Every structure is written in C-alpha cells, then in structure tokens.
Amino acid sequence: GKSTMLRAIGGIFSADEGTIDLHGHSISLLSIGVGFQKKLTGRENILLSGMVLGFEEDYIRERMNDIIEFSELGEFIDRPVKTYSSGMYSKLAFAITAILETEIILIDEVLSVGDAKFKKKSFKKMKSLISGENRTVLIVSHSIDTLQKLCTRVIWLHDGKLKMDGDPKEVLTAYDEFMSE
C-alpha cells in the first residue's frame, strides 16, 4: 500500500479514486527497481532521468560530474545499468535525486542501501535536503531510527488508513508499541 501510494504520487501508477495535485512542482521517486533504462549506461540514465524530471539538458550536464562523483560509480558510469548490483543502482538513483534536487522527493525504503560510507554520506545529504530548503520529502520506511533522525512530521498508515499524524517521537513510540503487541 505505501509503495503503491508513492508510485501514484510520483505518477507511475494512477489512483483508483481521488486526485493527486502537486501544484506544478517537480517530483522525483527514489525506489529500487524504478526509473532506469537497463540497456543504457549510468551516464545516459542520468541525462534521461533528469529530462524526465523536467530539467533542461544543459542543467543536467552542468551537474553530471557532481552526480557521478556522489554516486561513487567511477568507471562503471559508462557501463549499462543492467550490469549494476542493487547497491550500485541505488547509489546512482540517490545521487540523481540528491544532486538535481526536485521540489518534492519521494523515498521508498532505499536509505539503507549501500556500504556504511555511502549510507553515512546519503544520510547527511538527505538531512541537508530536508532541513535547508523549502522542499517536501516523503519517506516510506520501517526504520524508526532513520525516521526519528530525519523527519519533522510522521504519518502512520495502517491497512490503508491514517492511524496517526504528528510529532515523530509520539507517532513512532505509538507505532513501536503497536508492533510489539
């Protein structure tokens, strides 16, 4: 349900009922298995992904080296994405999302992917994206620790319905107690 909701907000799925209005904001979905053309190289996918997100080609090319550097893919950037491990795939997806900085970022359980060094770097970048800008970041995660450290508001959905909405500490404590029953 939660991943489906993110994909509907991101425009990948259409909602069965109701409407989703993004008020013209650019949006990116960071989710394992979504968004890349497997036969294209990482570099080609950066360009394609950026254009799909609505960015001008010149802007994407200006940010290309920053994306490649952040992704830590080195020479693999010029190999087809189909040859990437899931960690490499996630690093590239995160780097594109983090460096191009859309107004709305949707994150589906991918902050825990990659080696310890990359996780730390990603967490730091995500923290700066959330706190330093006028941006909406929607995270689907079961990691209470991650949500406590990153979020200023938490919404708990259960069986497709809103269970609780508010302060991260309050909502996550209630969630943890509920899951322990």
Predicted regions mapped to residue ranges:
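Helix-to-loop junction immediately C-terminal to a conserved catalytic motif
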Residues: 10
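ABC nucleotide-binding domain "signature motif"
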Residues: 16-27, 162
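Conserved ABC ATPase "signature" region
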Residues: 28, 47, 59-76
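H-loop/switch region of ABC-family ATPase nucleotide-binding domains
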Residues: 141-142
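A short, surface-exposed alpha-helical micro-motif characterized by mixed small hydrophobic
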Residues: 147-149
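Conserved ABC ATPase "signature" C-loop
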Residues: 159-160, 175
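ABC ATPase "signature
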Residues: 165-166
